[in-house]
Amino acid sequence: MAKILVVDDERVLVKGITFNLKNEGYQVETGYDGEEAVELAREGNFDLIILDLMMPKIDGLQACMRIREFSNVPIIMLTARSEDTDKIIGFECGADDYITKPFNILELKARIRALL
Protein backbone atom coordinates (compact mmCIF):
# COMPACT_ATOMS: atom_id res chain seq x y z
CA MET A 1 0.00 0.00 0.00
CA ALA A 2 1.04 3.61 -0.49
CA LYS A 3 3.29 5.49 1.91
CA ILE A 4 1.93 8.88 3.03
CA LEU A 5 3.61 11.73 4.92
CA VAL A 6 1.28 13.84 7.10
CA VAL A 7 2.69 17.16 8.36
CA ASP A 8 0.70 19.58 10.53
CA ASP A 9 1.51 21.42 13.76
CA GLU A 10 -1.86 20.34 15.24
CA ARG A 11 -0.85 17.03 16.81
CA VAL A 12 -4.44 15.92 17.48
CA LEU A 13 -5.28 16.41 13.81
CA VAL A 14 -2.18 14.47 12.72
CA LYS A 15 -3.15 11.64 15.06
CA GLY A 16 -6.70 11.52 13.66
CA ILE A 17 -5.59 11.54 10.03
CA THR A 18 -2.94 8.91 10.76
CA PHE A 19 -5.48 6.65 12.47
CA ASN A 20 -7.89 6.88 9.54
CA LEU A 21 -5.23 6.33 6.88
CA LYS A 22 -3.70 3.35 8.68
CA ASN A 23 -7.18 1.82 8.89
CA GLU A 24 -7.30 2.11 5.08
CA GLY A 25 -4.03 0.18 4.88
CA TYR A 26 -1.68 3.09 4.14
CA GLN A 27 1.77 3.39 5.69
CA VAL A 28 1.95 6.75 7.45
CA GLU A 29 4.82 8.87 8.75
CA THR A 30 4.30 12.19 10.51
CA GLY A 31 5.94 15.56 11.03
CA TYR A 32 4.99 18.75 12.83
CA ASP A 33 6.69 21.70 11.09
CA GLY A 34 7.78 22.85 7.65
CA GLU A 35 11.47 22.06 8.03
CA GLU A 36 10.64 18.54 9.17
CA ALA A 37 8.36 18.16 6.14
CA VAL A 38 11.22 18.92 3.76
CA GLU A 39 13.69 16.67 5.61
CA LEU A 40 11.27 13.73 5.76
CA ALA A 41 10.25 14.19 2.12
CA ARG A 42 13.92 14.12 1.09
CA GLU A 43 14.70 11.02 3.18
CA GLY A 44 11.52 9.01 2.60
CA ASN A 45 10.12 7.52 -0.54
CA PHE A 46 6.56 8.82 -0.18
CA ASP A 47 3.70 8.29 -2.59
CA LEU A 48 1.81 11.36 -1.30
CA ILE A 49 2.27 14.22 1.18
CA ILE A 50 -0.44 15.99 3.19
CA LEU A 51 0.90 19.38 4.21
CA ASP A 52 -0.56 22.08 6.45
CA LEU A 53 -0.17 25.65 5.25
CA MET A 54 0.48 27.49 8.52
CA MET A 55 3.28 25.77 10.45
CA PRO A 56 6.29 26.80 12.55
CA LYS A 57 9.81 27.31 11.17
CA ILE A 58 8.79 27.47 7.50
CA ASP A 59 5.21 27.53 6.26
CA GLY A 60 3.59 24.94 4.04
CA LEU A 61 4.03 27.03 0.89
CA GLN A 62 7.80 27.30 1.40
CA ALA A 63 7.97 23.60 2.30
CA CYS A 64 6.01 22.72 -0.83
CA MET A 65 8.35 24.77 -3.05
CA ARG A 66 11.42 23.19 -1.46
CA ILE A 67 10.00 19.69 -1.91
CA ARG A 68 9.29 20.50 -5.57
CA GLU A 69 13.01 21.16 -6.05
CA PHE A 70 13.69 17.41 -5.72
CA SER A 71 10.37 15.57 -6.00
CA ASN A 72 7.14 15.40 -8.00
CA VAL A 73 5.30 13.52 -5.24
CA PRO A 74 1.60 14.53 -5.08
CA ILE A 75 1.02 17.14 -2.36
CA ILE A 76 -2.32 17.95 -0.75
CA MET A 77 -2.38 21.27 1.11
CA LEU A 78 -4.62 21.09 4.17
CA THR A 79 -5.43 24.47 5.70
CA ALA A 80 -7.94 26.74 7.39
CA ARG A 81 -7.26 29.43 4.78
CA SER A 82 -10.15 29.22 2.33
CA GLU A 83 -9.83 32.35 0.19
CA ASP A 84 -9.52 31.74 -3.54
CA THR A 85 -6.24 33.66 -3.62
CA ASP A 86 -4.80 31.30 -0.97
CA LYS A 87 -5.78 28.30 -3.08
CA ILE A 88 -4.25 29.80 -6.21
CA ILE A 89 -1.00 30.55 -4.38
CA GLY A 90 -0.97 26.97 -3.07
CA PHE A 91 -1.27 25.59 -6.60
CA GLU A 92 1.37 28.00 -7.89
CA CYS A 93 3.76 26.77 -5.18
CA GLY A 94 3.36 23.20 -6.42
CA ALA A 95 0.38 21.71 -4.58
CA ASP A 96 -1.69 19.15 -6.47
CA ASP A 97 -4.81 19.60 -4.35
CA TYR A 98 -6.08 21.97 -1.64
CA ILE A 99 -8.51 21.08 1.15
CA THR A 100 -9.83 23.57 3.68
CA LYS A 101 -10.38 22.88 7.38
CA PRO A 102 -12.71 21.76 8.75
CA PHE A 103 -12.81 18.88 6.30
CA ASN A 104 -14.56 15.55 5.91
CA ILE A 105 -12.17 12.60 6.32
CA LEU A 106 -14.09 10.72 3.61
CA GLU A 107 -13.37 13.55 1.17
CA LEU A 108 -9.69 13.53 2.13
CA LYS A 109 -9.49 9.78 1.55
CA ALA A 110 -11.25 10.16 -1.83
CA ARG A 111 -8.80 12.87 -2.89
CA ILE A 112 -5.87 10.69 -1.81
CA ARG A 113 -7.19 7.80 -3.91
CA ALA A 114 -7.62 10.14 -6.89
CA LEU A 115 -3.98 11.27 -6.70
CA LEU A 116 -2.43 7.84 -6.19
Report each predicted region and the residues it spans.
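Charged docking surfaces used in two-component/phosphorelay signaling
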Residues: K15-N23
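Active-site residues of response regulator receiver
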Residues: D8, D52, T79
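Short hydrophobic/Thr-rich beta-strand motif most characteristic of the beta2 strand and flanking loop
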Residues: G25-Y32, L40
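The feature encodes the CheY-like receiver
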Residues: V14, P56, E83
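Acidic catalytic/metal-coordinating carboxylates
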Residues: Y32-E36, D59-Q62, I67, D86
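Conserved phosphotransfer cores of two-component systems
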Residues: R42-F46, R66-V73, C93
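Active-site beta3 strand of CheY-like receiver
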Residues: G44-I50, M55
